[in-house]
């Protein structure tokens, strides 16, 4: 079967069934057309995303940062305000807003030096750790993400993984060197120092430094060879949060396709169809899965015994009381394949 004919039919291949507490709700499947049950799930997921609570869900970092900023502005004591400022900066860092987080840590440092020197000394180590981490993340975002190579962020850093945009790692080293002089045995700071140094192309074998991790640390008695990263060259480089993966033949053409989910409330799955020529084509929209967001894990099986691979999607892991999110059963209805 050619890819174009599947392209026309794949929009009808998956329908969504609600699953709760381990029990299958058959009525939506039995009495609703695929489009109706899928739309019902889309609306349910949207409502849950809008109702998510940043107080209880510690992974809603952007919302939590804004929440702490509002609380800091309303704080009635200096200590409380400064505590909330630190929490806001940490949340911006976890949200991926590295430079905004840096601004927050720098603002806290300036205030603490001026009005609370004892508090500054008490939090000095933590502050320097986070400030250097902000710079490390800037370097990763500008190089590993925006200017990705097949060697990006693979340890130990090889020549192709050295950062072309150097300000992130250089900024980190400007903080880490004086911090390590004060905390010379701290392993976390040493680790960040080595990452920043390697991404700048510094060689531990030729540069004498007491904080280097020996190159022998990365050696192994077992040579398993090299697995080159070819995702970008075959159309399979998906940039998303952690999620599930199923590799199987979804359209019955004898070729292995790729289906991945992403954990975030608003993150769509990605369906990549094997074209038989060594590449994959994104067919997510045609598959009808685009708005069925979220999902940390997936399980594949032919639950209805029609010869097609179906997919069970699990949501809500690690979210505690916020994790009561309906699961999905995506029925592959590729009849005639």
How would you name each of these model-derived features?
Residues 35-52, 78-90, 121-158, 187-194:
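Amphipathic alpha-helical repeat scaffolds of TPR domains
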Residues 205-240, 272-293, 328-337:
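Blade-edge motifs of beta-propeller repeat domains
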Residues 243-252, 273, 286, 295-305:
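Beta-propeller blade termini
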Residues 52-69, 96-111, 165-174, 221:
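Helix-turn-helix repeat elements of alpha-solenoid scaffolds
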Residues 245, 255-262, 311-315:
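Hydrophobic beta-strand segments that make up the repeating blades of beta-propeller
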Residues 263-267, 320-325:
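Short, solvent-exposed loop/turn segments at conserved positions within beta-propeller repeat blades
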Residues 107-125, 133-178, 201-223:
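Short coil/linker segments at helix-helix boundaries
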